[in-house]
Amino acid sequence: MSFTLHSVFFTLKVSSFLGSLVGLCLGLEFMGLPNQWARYLRWDASTRSDLSFQFKTNVSTGLLLYLDDGGVCDFLCLSLVDGRVQLRFSMDCAETTVLSNKQVNDSSWHFLMVSRDRVRTGLVIDGEGQSGELRAQRPYMDVVSDLFLGGGPADIRPSALTLDGVQNMPGFKGLMLDLKYGNSEPRLLGSQSVQLEAEGPCGERPCENGGICFLLDGHPTCDCSTTGYGGTLCSEDVSQGPGLSHLMMSEQGRSKAREENVATFRGSEYLSYDLSQNPIQSSSSEITLSFKTWQRNGLILHTGKSADYVNLALKDGAVSLVINLGSGAFEAIVEPVNGKFNDNAWHDVKVTRNLRQVTISVDGILTTTGYTQEDYTMLGSDDSSYVGPSPSTADLPGSPVSNNFMGCLKEVVYKNNDIRLELSRLARIGATKMKIYGEVVFKCENVATLDPINFETPEAYISLPKWNTKRMGSISFDFRTTEPNGLILLTHGKPQERKDVRSQKNTKVDFFAVELLDGNLYLLLDMGSGTIKVKATQKKANDGEWYHVDIQRDGRSGTISVNSRRTPFTASGQSEILDLEGDMYLGGLPENRAGLILPTELWTAMLNYGYVGCIRDLFIDGRSKNIRQLAEMQNAAGVKSSCSRMSAKQCDSYPCKNNAVCKDGWNRFICDCTGTGYWGRTCEREASILSYDGSMYMKVIMPMVMHTEAEDVSFRFMSQRAYGLLVATTSRDSADTLRLELDGGRVKLMVNLDCIRINCNSSKGPETLYAGQKLNDNEWHTVRVVRRGKSLKLTVDDDVAEGTMVGDHTRLEFHNIETGIMTEKRYISVVPSSFIGHLQSLMFNGLLYIDLCKNGDIDYCELKARFGLRNIIADPVTFKTKSSYLTLATLQAYTSMHLFFQFKTTSADGFILFNSGDGNNFIAVELVKGYIHYVFDLGNGPNVIKGNSDRPLNDNQWHNVVITRDNSNTHSLKVDTKVVTQVINGAKNLDLKGDLYMAGLAQGMYSNLPKLVASRDGFQGCLASVDLNGRLPDLINDALHRSGQIDRGCEGPSTTCQEDSCANQGVCMQQWEGFTCDCSMTSYSGNQCNDPGATYIFGKSGGLILYTWPANDRPSTRSDRLAVGFSTTVKDGVLVRIDSAPGLGDFLQLHIEQGKIGVVFNIGTVDISIKEERTPVNDGKYHVVRFTRNGANATLQVDNWPVNEHYPTGNTDNERRQMVKQKIPFKYNRPVEEWLQEKGRQLTIFNTQAQIAIGGKDKGRLFQGQLSGLYYDGLKVLNMAAENNPNIKINGSVRLVGEVPSVSGTTHTTSMPPEMSTTVMETTTTMATTTTRKNRSTASIQPTSDDLVSSAECSSDDEDFVECEPSTGRSDKSLSTSIFEGGYKAHAPKWESKDFRPNKVSETSRTTTTSLSPELIRFTASSSSGMVPKLPAGKMNNRDLKPQPDIVLLPLPTAYELDSTKLKSPLITCPMFRNVPTANPTEPGIRRVPGASEVIRESNSTTGMVVGIVAAAALCILILLYAMYKYRNRDEGSYQVDETRNYISNSAQSNGTLMKEKQASSKSGHKKQKNKDKEYYV
């Protein structure tokens, strides 16, 4: 009876449903008429929804569908374009278009679906899909209008339509039917010019025997349930047997009438049927279901527990069955012939079991049969059955996957001999034993796919929420890459202090990580008792294919599966809790790693290897993570929401520059810049070079103690020494070190892990490797070290050495990375020798430390070495006479020898080195007729090797000498680049005793010298960089005995200004007994301007150096000079700013704007700007900028580039000159005109300067990089800051580099420069620098300057004639003009009014190329009595000395280019002359050479000023008349600078800049022009 009732109910249900199907087969026929439309209720397409219909047409254009938001931004439009369907849509005014590939105007029926998923919209035509994605600010679409098919009403206002022109689009012509919003049918609101059409796919009546036709997925389908027939067309008689129609009726297979027993699962919902009250025991059973999904892995159904269970799942797109009857699991995999089952199409699964035989079939075609183990035939189930996901899929017995299912399941039925469970129907009707967890939707909805993401760069990453796992958990994902290394996943817990056996604290954390290293996948786990590292792959997994990783943990144990290969693991210790905190990082780590504790065992993290490749289907504890959405929300840089592998090799286009090696990565090229001297993505940026002289070093101090088990180290070096420390890691607490040094011309790698301190049992001491030969050849060599645990590999150029460390201890501890000198010596028994040479491109675990230190990107860098490829002269010593010598301890060179030294001399002969020994053994090095001789005797008789230099070496230039002897008794002598080699047979050992004599012998020893030794006198000259077989002696302090005149440093024989006397455009100032160099405007210091000035590095966070003048000593200036050296990569920032007292508003600012340097200043009127427009300066190279101002006139010059000039315009001076010509006799016009010109009423004074701000932090325009040698109007502010001047405050990220450089004083010869103090200057100019390590001088800053005078507390603008009481802080009554710090000062009478002070110096006019015009008559005040005249270099004065002008300023054409060591236009200086172009106030249209600086004192009263004006003008005229009358015909009565003799014709050298006066006219030497060309000085 129950069967009958059930049948009646079924019949009624089907009948009512098929009644609605008749309506669905009625379509809409559109005729293509104007103003035709069919209007449906609004479709909610805001976030997620599907729309579908079927259509047929033979036209190529027409509007199919349209909706919008009422004329604002959003719309969706479907139309036909050239016979294909076009989808246009817009969200938040961002628009895109999708065009189908398939032609549809073929008069055939086509199925169309539009799928909305937030910013993504898909278009599917007959199963072929495309999608478009928008970068909109909001992830939803606003929909206001109803939905229109076939066209739109013409009566709608165009302004109410979002898409312009939609009303003008042609209407659709054809048939449409079966319009659905998801699975529901929308209500038709109205139509116009549209007919109902009964045709359609079912119009041909394909069903026989009364079967009812309906559409299923766009195809006609027959319902035969009421006919008694079966088959596709209801043509098969059911009574003929239990065929397919019988199965369809009894099992409700694919009937549309039973589609309501469908459920959608999104990963967290699941169904559970309770079997605990009625356990099932059966010998045979059957499971049937259908599924539809995009997902590759996921649980479909599970029943049973322990050893009795059935598990059905998707595994990598195939159907997996695992069944266990208690005797062992039977596993079966069914895979399709083409593609995968996760194609979002319906697939039918049937599992049958009869005793031990198990059969599984998919879609009735693909079938697999097998047998369970042993004789167990009963399946017992007394637990719950799960449909779809489960609460913990990873913990289910036999589950091959840990993912929950995402997709649709329908008609899930379990039956055996006794029971039939229609699980889908039971869930839908809410049966008591069927529990529903989550929001299960009982219809099939579109489930968003878990799109893959692509990490395009190693720096890319995304962060995931905290993983709440304690005792158990699971993670699964797929990855795909071609790169061998990368951190895939890391999460860790709170730091904990743990103590080892020696009570050494060590910060440890619980952590969980997955990494790809050398192509293999590793799982790392630490639960508090030590780290385990599990290798999960047998072959490399970086072949570009997808790999599925499934990790399941239960307490301490678990498994990791890669594809189908399982690897079990067990954590250390007893803890079963994994205590995690904070985010989980996927693909890499953030740049700011504050708070991150990186496990030592996680090598990819320590080596900075980020993952580059694709990841998809991330499930944590069975629940999916939409990582594409997370990446979008985090705006993750370098993460792309797609995954496709480029077919073309990236290196085929040869993207790497400078001979770098190109490697193909994942959709990218990788340029290996090692050994090129460059860095960057394509190795396009030149790496910084550090020069070391044996006393210099760079030390990187780690922000915290580092522990590593893997290191990548690479760098380039160049040296002439055979010994010296290159790079080493050092620890403050242990003897741990990884050290690379030169040892006998080879690179020695020593790794020492301090096993004793941590009480480990198996350590044999340091591991040592050697590679390379004769590397002290002054050529670049590349070193690379790779350590992975116990494995070591050292590569020097092409020489490779490998080794394996003995012992279990592999952890390296270090606090510092040191180069040049090892400063951390507490645990070092033998300190390595210091390095002399050059180092470049030091990379340690992915960080380029030299450039990071130079650019200020790290704050923990001690820098004593010097930037740039420099000629290194270390520790020079001068032997002033041939009788001078010293002795050192015996030379130790028994089995082998490496000697190196540098010398410079003008003598052709002399002893350099001598050491005698046992028997006849000796060694001697001497200079004979200008050539080096190496003489020795090892016991077989004396031998001599003579250098083969191209010319004699006594040319007063530095030369390098290398002498070596190896174990094979091969001797070589290398002088500069010339090498002579000789093999000596016989004795191989050199047994020396007694003292080693340097530069000479005691007087009585010359008569007893061995044969072949030619010298009978000592060496006169300079020795430097002496290396005695790895020992660097201090020739003076280490000497056992000294005789004669021996001084530290190297003084040359020249005492007059030469073209190479001053480097870097310094000005040579000739004195009677020598010369000095004015380095003010060079940014350098030292006696020869070749030592760097005080240098500060400003970091990323910004810094400020603020100098404040004392309140009673604030200067006001008419002219200013500013110079500074810098290197930076920022596009915008303020370098220096000088401000006047509050309320005045005067300022001067040097800044970088859009990468270009410029100056803006205001002296009381408007802002005046001058800028270098030609070339950006933020290229990371070292530049020197010079700025001069005289009134409103200004010049700006960068390096030796053309000078930029600014001259104001106006008519004031023209009017004044016209007045002069009318009122004053003609012959006095010119001097008075010049005087009036200077006193123009334009504002020219920079008033009451109060402070100098360096770094830009106070203005919010931060400067990052280095500043060096800042000079402003006599103040060397950076030197003052380094000496802790009380008027200077330093804030922020500002770091002094090296030590305070000394300031040159007045010397009478070219004396030894002070020690090479550290700076940060990038230059390609090779400059000789002589240095010492002792007797460092401190800089002395003079408070006076050439153009400053205190205005005390009197703050007034330039032209305000307001009484102001001057400060009494200065007692001098004369104007003091300092030519250079420590130099002479010229004094002139004090002028009480600023407007009546005559021009101190008038300069000739010049063009924009700074050439000189005919000179003008020069006016100056009388100099003080007793002032010594200063003559041009090389010029002798045979006449009586007359008072000379205070200062004469001439412009200096730039002499250096960055890529040249030659002068462009060497000039000879006049005594005390400046070399920097300055600016003079001048009349409009006439450009003049910049003049001298002026200092203004303000008058005490207006009355005094007026009286002074009258008196001074009368006095000047009288003096002028008297002078011209008295000296008119007397040549001998005045001194004229004879400039025709000032030129020194020496060729330009590499380290000097001199200044030469131009003649006013080529005819000035003629006698008849003599009187006209005189310069008169009063």
Swiss-Prot record:
Molecular function (Gene Ontology), one example: metal ion binding
Keywords assigned by UniProt, alphabetized: Calcium, Cell adhesion, Cell membrane, Cell projection, Disulfide bond, EGF-like domain, Glycoprotein, Heparan sulfate, Membrane, Metal-binding, Proteoglycan, Repeat, Signal, Synapse, Transmembrane, Transmembrane helix
TM segment ranges: 1504-1524
User: Where does the chain bind Ca(2+) 1?
Assistant: 308, 325, 378
Residue spans of biased composition, Polar residues class = 1337-1352
> Which residue intervals define the domain Laminin G-like in the entry?
28-202, 260-444, 451-643, 689-861, 875-1050, 1094-1294
Do you know which InterPro entries this protein is assigned to? ConA-like_dom_sf, EGF-like_dom, EGF-type_Asp/Asn_hydroxyl_site, Laminin_G, Neurexin-like, Neurexin-related_CASP, Syndecan/Neurexin_dom
| Quaternary organization | The laminin G-like domain 2 binds to NXPH1. Isoform 8/alpha-4B binds to alpha-dystroglycan. The cytoplasmic C-terminal region binds to CASK. Specific isoforms bind neuroligins NLGN1, NLGN2 and NLGN3. Interacts with CLSTN3.
How is this protein named in the record?
A: Neurexin-3
The record lists the lineage as: Eukaryota, Metazoa, Chordata, Craniata, Vertebrata
